[in-house]
Amino acid sequence: MTHLYAHIRRAGAALTLLVSLSSICSCDDGAIEEHHQPTQETNTYTLRFCANIKGVSSWNGQYSVALACFDSESEYAKTVKTLHDTDADEDRDTILLSGVGTDISTVEVAILSPLRRRIATIASFKISADISDSDTIVIDAGDIEADMFVSINRFVFQGNNCSRCHSGSSPASDLNLSADVAYSNILNIPSVKSPSTLRVKPGDADNSYLYRIITDENIGSHYAHTGLFTDAPQQAFIDIIKSWINAGAK
């Protein structure tokens, strides 16, 4: 009888342990499930971004083009997704981005620093402030040109007022930097100020007049072009231009 009672006690203890372990496993499974299914407390939603993106593969150096989410308070992206060129046999890419916070105000195809600071915005899409975490936001962005030189042309030659002096029938230093002719007027063309130096010498930024005039205050120009690059995003384009030239200026 004593032996039978001992067996019953051991069986009861084993059953209690089994129930306890089962409870632990159930809690773990529940936590994992909740982690992957956002609730009202997570304040996030899913973004579906559709676009035909070209030129991303032309980028080199420390700066890159990415799909980035920004709030209204900071120049640093809160969520980032790496981009690639849309394949030739595809109409457009579809990019899914989950866990996007409801504090995000814009979704951008942007040039970013290694620390995810916005250098320039290639395309921007405003997010409504009244979204809920159960929403899936769909953005059809159409065609986006993200080529490295196209960005230099847009944000430096045109956006930084270079073409104000370097355009028209009598451009400064006989250099027309209007958007449609800027590339052909700088590549392998001797500088008027320094005929022995090419404006852009592919593969050699240090010996390209374009790079030298924006980095050297003593180059001899009557206008200090270094003054065009004063804040951090503009200064970043000095490195971007250098990387573009050293990679072959394509």
Regions found by a protein language model. Give the residues of each.
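Aromatic- and Gly/Pro-enriched helix-to-coil junctions and flexible linker segments
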Residues: 27-92, 100-250
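C-terminal motif of bacterial Sec signal peptides marking the signal peptidase cleavage site
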Residues: 22-26
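Acyl-donor (CoA/ACP) binding surface of acyl/acetyltransferases
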Residues: 96
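Bacterial N-terminal signal peptides that target proteins for export
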Residues: 2-15
